Amino acid sequence: MAKHIVELTDALSNKIAAGEVVERPASVVKELVENAIDAGSTVIDILVEEAGLNKITIIDNGSGIEEEDVATAFLRHATSKIKNEADLFRVHTLGFRGEALPSIASVSHLSMETSTGETKGTTISLEGGKIMEQKSGHARKGTQIEVSQLFFNTPARLKYLKSLPTELGNITDILNRLALAHPDISFRFSHNGKPLLQTNGNGDLRQVIAAIYGVSIARKSIPVKAESLDFNISGYAVLPEVNRSNRNYISTIINGRFIKNFALVKAIQEGYHTLLPIGRFPIIVLQIEMDPIIVDVNVHPAKLEVRLSKEKELGQLISQMIKEAFHQLQLIPDGEVSKKQKEQQKSEQIQMSFEENKLPKETPTLFSKPNVPEYVPSDEDTSREDDFILETLPTYDSKIQPEQAEEPKERIPKMYPIGQMHATYIFAQNENGLYIIDQHAAQERIKYEFYREKIGEVSRELQELLVPIVLEFPTDEYVRLEEQKTKLEEVGVFLENFGQNSFIIRAHPTWFPKNQEEEMLREIIDEALSAPSISIHKLREDTAIMMSCKKSIKANHYLTMQDMEALLDTLREASDPFTCPHGRPVIIQYSTYELEKMFKRVM
């Protein structure tokens, strides 16, 4: 017998909605803080006990709620943020579904005090979504919400929560992102009475970066900016020498909303291309403003994922912006490696939330900077801390002046070789100090830029083979190469069908290494076969990297003084001479001052 279809009760519907909206304590914090932001708050206090499982309290100084609207706020899909269908396509607020408050209330004990500041305040208490008490009373302007006994009526949900440190890390991560997205709001977050995050809300994004990641990271950041007809991008990109083992430090913010978008992350990585070692990722914060009509935030209840109608154009703008910003800088890292950096490279399993909540000790930087003592904020001294950070962070101007554009500054200075160490590293000097150059990485960069340019012009420089090369392949690879023939021709591999599962090659680019033509051709074909589908841009890039790596001088190769001098002079002509195509550093510098300090000649 078929079962009857019945309408679910509001209580059950709210619990189902809570399963999507309220996954863990961090979800509660996110929804309530976003409501506070939408209410126009300038100061938001977040007080958490036992990673939110015991109690979560959010206090803001926003617009508050009228007394007659307080009970309505806990009804499903009741909201003040949109009125009609047209508003759904021009969402200017972080919340708009009207699901957060009823969903949170349905799985917790919740109390709220709110006032618009014009009339008496209102207090309301709910348990499991049911209103237990509502009364008028005195309250300051704004809203205070306290959530306790989370998931008391859905014990199965508690089984899926992680350890307290993990849940606290999730909360901290969300608050870090919200603080980065809204530097004009003061966030004050504490756990069990201990302050974990404090920002002053003065609108300076770099100060927020310092508060979250530490002053040393903020010092290593440069401003980036770009705009088009559709997009306005600003933010800070941290120098490539400071990187991480995961993508957690990439923050993309659209219209004040932190979002996750794979295409934009790929665009950021493309902007850092060849500047980062393989498997390493940048630290960057981008704030992107656009017309709400071209971004759809109504994709998922958590609103972390969005759809962009001009995603490709935005990605290209981001990549180009980052490349241009770093192209103006001299990216030679200091020779000294701090203990903290060593420990970071050994183990990076610490969540971004906990990494640098205290201001770290001074570490060597690429730029000159004032000496800054270690400083740990006290509970009473947050305003002084913010002033301290502001005063000690240098300002970088990433804009090129017209006169600078006419006479571009050398990317690396003239260096005079003085010897070779272990037949691998070149030692050079000038008036600025000592330079150590990885000879393989240096020539790899030079050859990479040469091949990258040549691979785009293969049709003009072809050499006929006296003896054509015949290559045989398994059926599956033969079929795939048939599909890739056009792309392969653009990188210098011209395949003609030659019998069953075979191709013949009659010519190759003139810049192929002599006596290694067949090896080179097979390497390029292997690159094309290594991925199910590959773009011509990626194939060219991978081919240039592969050829430069294989054809560069290796370690344990002795060079004459003339060879070293020629290599360094050629390196100075490279467009990006600071890293090899794999992102490893080419040059490390010890300034004269650092050397004199090591030998105690200066104090």
Swiss-Prot record:
SMART domains named among the record's database cross-references: DNA_mis_repair, MutL_C
Region of interest: Disordered: 336-355, 361-384
Compositionally biased region (Basic and acidic residues): 336-346
One GO location term (cellular component): mismatch repair complex
NCBIfam families: mutl
CDD domains, alphabetized: HATPase_MutL-MLH-PMS-like, MutL_Trans
Function field: This protein is involved in the repair of mismatches in DNA. It is required for dam-dependent methyl-directed DNA mismatch repair. May act as a 'molecular matchmaker', a protein that promotes the formation of a stable complex between two or more DNA-binding proteins in an ATP-dependent manner without itself being part of a final effector complex.
Family: Belongs to the DNA mismatch repair MutL/HexB family.
Name this protein carries in UniProt: DNA mismatch repair protein MutL
GO molecular function, one term: ATP-dependent DNA damage sensor activity
Species the sequence originates in: Listeria welshimeri serovar 6b (strain ATCC 35897 / DSM 20650 / CCUG 15529 / CIP 8149 / NCTC 11857 / SLCC 5334 / V8)
GO biological process, one term: mismatch repair
Top-level taxon of the source organism: Bacteria
Keywords: DNA damage, DNA repair
